[in-house]
Amino acid sequence: HIVNGSFHIADAVLLFLLLRLIFRKHLPAFLAALVFLAHPLQTEAVTMVTGLGDSLSVFFVLLGLYLYFRLPERPGLPLYAYILALMSKESAIVMPALLFLTDLFYDFGNHKNSYDSRNHRSRVLPLLPFIGIALVYILLRATILNFSNSFNFYNGEGLFASSVLIRLFTFFRVLTVYFGLLILPVQLHMERSVEIALNFLSPSVIFGGLAFLSLVGLAIFSLRFLRWRTFGFGILWFFIALSPTSNILVP
């Protein structure tokens, strides 16, 4: 409990430092870190021994992001943090995408707060070592580290494993559950199961699908209007971070 709790507190501190660096304001960063620290949904990561992997991976991802933008003259440090994040939990593989997203929305290259002030090539080139590490990790998981069918957790050809559409509908249903727990965190327990969605004609699937399309639309809208960029940044961060466990492409 001490170890898990300590890393959770450290994650909140790093989140505050990163958001303060991004927004250049103390209050929004503090409030976001406070919600992260105290939200009941974090209970599993703090109280369960097996939840340490989540806290560790978040710690190294946030550390890598902070070092990448705070100390650009030390490019090796965030790379080490990325490797440690991957060794903690493989969902950290999305860190290069989070780096690109942050630089795109807040333009740490020249601090002009403009999406068009630098071309995307200059943003992508520093990320090539991170992408290389991610590709090597995927190769290892597909070969010598393929302990238990890495890219298909279902041994049979069930509906969920064989149909991308059903996985997408189920993802919409899961989004409904996620948003509900974020707003009203009740009946929290381990190993929450969600019924597979066989079609779109279900209230939870429809709500999740509409929420997804609306949020993605708002994120795209924010690209054209800087005053909305914080909303777009948060929405895209949420879906990028969720993508490794969404089961849409890989069941």
Tell where the protein language model's regions lie, with residue ranges.
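Polytopic membrane enzymes that build or remodel cell-surface glycoconjugates and lipids
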Residues: 1-251
